[in-house]
């Protein structure tokens, strides 16, 4: 029987060529990219090439691209890092009520374990955040806003550029993070055009890439 796979938003099949390249790297170019020997130099080339590719796709600088183990770690690092680094400026964080657990659980951790105050924005009947609620939630203690690009359950697309514009108009120093895990590969995402400071993606869900588990 021919298989019909309808769960690509959860995990995609890797292209055979991608699998072959991964096998080559693991079996031949397996050096530590931080090492100075030949194997290390060859391994470092892959990382540099990947950074160049993402920087070109996103229209950002290579130094602004960071690799993590996946979407959850990227979200965790962005939220916890930004919150802790800016705690002297304020302790108020904003997110939506329908974020992925990688965001919700991290916000709860910051709220319950580290004393931050979190506002969870409501959404309308289409699963989109209410921009008026975002305006009302902003205050002098707000240091970070995190809104997902595309919802992983119902597929609603958030008005990221409009939301970021509202935040930056209120206070340009408030950091804006977007979880674009479900949006990357489906939409053209340019962080600077969107006016966001941090953007998390994961190739697992939207492209024929190797698995991260």
Stretches with model-predicted labels:
Residues 82-104, 117-122:
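Conserved PLP-anchoring active-site segment centered on the Schiff-base-forming lysine
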Residues 61-65, 89-91, 140-141, 173:
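Short acidic capping loops at alpha-helix termini that bridge into adjacent secondary structure
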Residues 119, 123-183:
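Active-site phosphate-binding strand-loop segment of PLP-dependent enzymes
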Residues 205-213:
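Single conserved hydrophobic/aromatic residue that forms the stacking wall/gate
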Residues 1-35:
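N-terminal "arm"/small-domain region of PLP-dependent enzymes with the aminotransferase-like
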């Amino acid at each position: 029987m021919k298989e019909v796979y309808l769960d690509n938003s959860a995990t995609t099949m890797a292209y055979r060529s991608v699998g072959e390249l991964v096998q080559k790297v693991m079996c031949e170019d397996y050096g530590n990219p931080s090492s100075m020997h030949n194997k290390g130099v060859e391994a470092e080339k892959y990382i540099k090439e990947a950074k160049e590719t993402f920087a070109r796709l996103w229209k950002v600088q290579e130094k602004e691209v960071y690799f993590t183990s996946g979407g959850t770690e990227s979200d965790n690092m962005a939220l916890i890092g930004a919150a802790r680094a800016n705690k002297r400026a304020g302790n108020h964080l904003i997110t939506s009520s329908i974020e992925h657990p990688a965001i919700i659980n991290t916000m709860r951790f910051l709220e319950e374990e580290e004393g931050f105050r979190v506002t969870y924005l409501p959404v309308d009947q289409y699963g989109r955040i209410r921009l008026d609620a975002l305006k009302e939630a902003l205050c002098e203690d707000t240091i970070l806003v995190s809104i997902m690009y595309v919802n992983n359950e119902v597929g609603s697309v958030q008005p990221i550029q409009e939301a970021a514009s509202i935040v930056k108009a209120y206070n340009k120093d408030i950091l804006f993070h977007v979880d674009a895990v479900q949006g990357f590969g489906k939409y053209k995402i340019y962080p600077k055009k969107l006016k966001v400071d941090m953007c998390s993606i994961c190739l697992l869900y939207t492209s024929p890439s190797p698995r991260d588990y």
